[in-house]
């Protein structure tokens, strides 16, 4: 029997209709796929790194943006040559922002066809230094990182509510976060600086599902897009959400955009930070771009 050539990492305890269909679909996979089950939150990183050490060169992350983030952090470790690895994506999450960004189908079977066809694209990998409960840490993210309102909302979201109602749990948490006083933030980069009460940095265009928060962002140009809201309150956020739904937030006078290759964001040290939809730590942030560092399997029309 041939040795498996693809490692597929998935969460065996995932709930919901899509997860149930996925488990049934697993039985249809060919023998060249090794199934690797996560054992706890965060375990996907170590499993991905071990899979590469075991000789696998195609690693498939099955889950949402948080799972993909974990897998990519495992692939980007010092002992892993990430440029020699292909990342496949089977989107099973709440938002699936990274999959949408790269045009990967939200259908598991069609996403698997993308993995099998083998077309790839090199995308940028942002590297961030931040504070965690264990002290200073360094990690990568794939799509976006935010400090202020969305960090607060993600950091305090009810996990039980998220399991029941999905994306609506984030809306409830955002409404709750708006009751609290927003932090005063400042960003610095070589060409300038900005101040505001909410800041989000995008590697690609998409945010929160199908919405384009960063309409001019490109995932492989060596640049990040910084979105700044000078003030945060219920009225401003409601108007910003409407503008984003219409795809016109970049024309809105109450928001500013800046294109950078590296930057620092500072603010109150207890300011929560989210990356790819998961809480990851607190300020300050130092971010830089590792250009075209990650090889992702994509539909033929989106390949390099």
Feature locations, PLM:
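ATP/nucleoside-binding phosphotransfer catalytic cores, i.e., glycine-rich phosphate-binding loops
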Residues: 189-193, 218, 228-304
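Short acidic/glycine-rich loop or secondary-structure boundary segments that cap or lie
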Residues: 150-153, 195, 207-210, 234-237
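Gly/Ser/Thr-rich active-site loops/lids in small-molecule metabolic enzymes
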Residues: 161-168, 215-236
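Glycine-rich phosphate/pyrophosphate-binding beta-alpha loops
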Residues: 146, 150, 200-213, 279
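A generic structural signal for short beta-strands and their flanking turns/coil linkers
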Residues: 181-183, 195-197, 220-225, 259-261
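ATP/NTP phosphate-donor binding region
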Residues: 1-62, 69, 73, 303
């Amino acid at each position: 029997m041939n040795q498996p050539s693809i490692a597929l990492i998935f969460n065996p305890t995932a709930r919901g209709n899509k997860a149930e269909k996925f488990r049934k679909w697993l039985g249809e996979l060919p023998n060249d796929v090794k199934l690797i089950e996560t054992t706890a939150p965060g375990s996907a990183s170590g499993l991905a790194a071990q899979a590469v050490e075991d000789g696998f060169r195609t690693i498939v992350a099955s889950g949402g943006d948080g799972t993909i983030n974990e897998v990519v952090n495992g692939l980007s470790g010092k002992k892993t040559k990430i440029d020699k690895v292909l990342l496949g994506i089977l989107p099973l999450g709440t938002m699936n922002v990274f999959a949408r960004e790269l045009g990967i189908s939200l259908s598991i079977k069609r996403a698997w066809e993308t993995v099998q066809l083998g077309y790839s694209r090199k995308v940028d990998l942002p590297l961030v230094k931040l504070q965690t409960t264990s002290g200073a840490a360094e990690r990568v993210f794939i799509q976006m990182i935010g400090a202020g309102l969305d960090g607060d909302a993600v950091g305090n979201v009810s996990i039980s509510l998220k399991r029941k109602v999905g994306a609506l749990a984030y809306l409830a948490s955002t409404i709750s976060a708006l009751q609290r006083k927003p932090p005063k933030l400042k960003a610095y980069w070589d060409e300038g600086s900005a101040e505001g009460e909410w800041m989000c940095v995008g590697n690609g265009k998409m945010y929160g599902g199908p919405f384009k928060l960063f309409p001019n962002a490109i995932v492989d140009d060596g640049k990040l897009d910084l979105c700044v809201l000078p003030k945060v309150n219920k009225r401003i956020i409601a108007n910003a959400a409407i503008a984003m739904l219409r795809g016109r937030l970049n024309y809105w006078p109450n928001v500013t955009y800046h294109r950078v290759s590296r930057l620092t964001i500072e603010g109150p040290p207890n300011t929560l930070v989210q990356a790819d939809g998961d809480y990851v730590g607190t300020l300050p942030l130092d971010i830089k771009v590792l250009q075209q560092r990650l090889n992702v399997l994509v539909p033929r029309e989106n390949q390099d």
